[in-house]
Amino acid sequence: ERLVGSEMCIRDRALGLCGCDGQMILAQKLDSEVDLGFVGDIKKVTTKPIVDALNNGYVPIISTVGVGEDGQSYNINADTAAARIASCLRAEKLILMTDIVGLLEDKDDDSTLIPQVNVSDVPYLKKKGIISGGMIPKIDCCVEAVRRGVKKTTIIDLSLIHISEPTR
């Protein structure tokens, strides 16, 4: 399956949505050892605005700012929001984009790409240090999405997506 994304292709169908619009992403302050300011965690996702956009032929582009019950805005990790939204929509597939090839057995060798990981493999791969650094939250989001019903997740290198003018 090939992901083709081009601003030129979706410009007329893109619809910007913000998670705080109509409390689409209801959030709360992230509970952490260090105060991270206005960083939030998702309490609830209301999918109606997304479903309405999709049903009307639009491609929703969602800013991952959530809102607390008190009206405070919170920044939500984009991968976390994508995983939660995908599961709430009962999506078949979640695609996360990154700036690296993917999960590598040797982080310095792109030829060691691990093409598939099962949820049950994740603890071992973390313990072995293969899942580390910035890949930890991406893999955790994929695991969470699968546990919440998304059938398949993919982490793709954004540089592999060819963006060009559409054929006219």
Segments (PLM) and residue ranges:
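Single conserved hydrophobic/aromatic residue that forms the stacking wall/gate
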Residues: E1-G5, I10, I161-T167
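N-terminal glycine-rich phosphate/adenylate-binding segment common to multiple enzyme folds
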Residues: S6, R11-G16, Q23-M24
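Active-site phosphate/oxyanion-binding loops
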Residues: C20-V59, S63-I155, L160, S164, ...
